[in-house]
């Protein structure tokens, strides 16, 4: 399927699974190349497991099946330098960024409420 974002490049955080993966895949199906970012490791203060590197790899595989390009990066959205590096890698590959989907997000619910 090719659609209204044909030839665009999307930078998607939280892309390893869940809504982030869903956005990345839909944008790819509609013609966008993807720069996919996720932390891919657990955070001590969060009481549930975060995405794993394998989850981000699966997102890449699914995007590639659409025929679109993807650059992945394990990066913590709380660290500007990590995001900058991921963005620069994506721009080096695709030349630009047209769309940003800031989907990374967690709920800090460790222990009893």
Located regions from the model:
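Canonical Rossmann dinucleotide-binding motif of NAD(H)/NADP(H)-dependent dehydrogenases/reductases
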Residues: 2-42
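Structural signature of beta-strand start/N-cap positions in the alpha/beta core
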Residues: 9, 33, 69-71, 96-98
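Rossmann-fold scaffold of SDR-type NAD(P)-dependent oxidoreductases
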Residues: 13, 74, 97-105
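Glycine/Thr-rich phosphate-binding loops of Rossmann-like dinucleotide-binding domains
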Residues: 20, 44-45, 110-111
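Glycine-rich phosphate-binding loop and adjoining beta1-alpha1-beta2 segment
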Residues: 38-62
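Active-site loop/turn elements of alpha/beta-hydrolase fold enzymes
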Residues: 39, 77, 106
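Conserved mid-core segment of classical short-chain dehydrogenase/reductases
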Residues: 50-57, 84, 107-113
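Conserved amphipathic alpha-helix within the SDR
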Residues: 60-64, 70-96
């Amino acid at each position: 399927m090719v659609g209204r974002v044909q030839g665009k490049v999307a930078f998607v955080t939280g892309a390893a699974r869940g809504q982030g993966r869903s956005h990345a895949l839909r944008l790819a199906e509609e013609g966008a190349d993807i720069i996919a970012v996720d932390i891919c490791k657990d955070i001590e203060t969060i009481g549930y497991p975060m995405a794993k590197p394998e989850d981000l790899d699966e997102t890449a595989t699914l995007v590639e099946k659409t025929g679109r390009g993807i650059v992945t990066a394990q990066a913590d959205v709380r660290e500007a330098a990590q995001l900058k590096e991921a963005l620069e890698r994506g721009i080096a590959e695709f030349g630009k960024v047209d769309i940003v989907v800031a989907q990374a997000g967690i709920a800090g619910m460790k222990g009893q409420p």
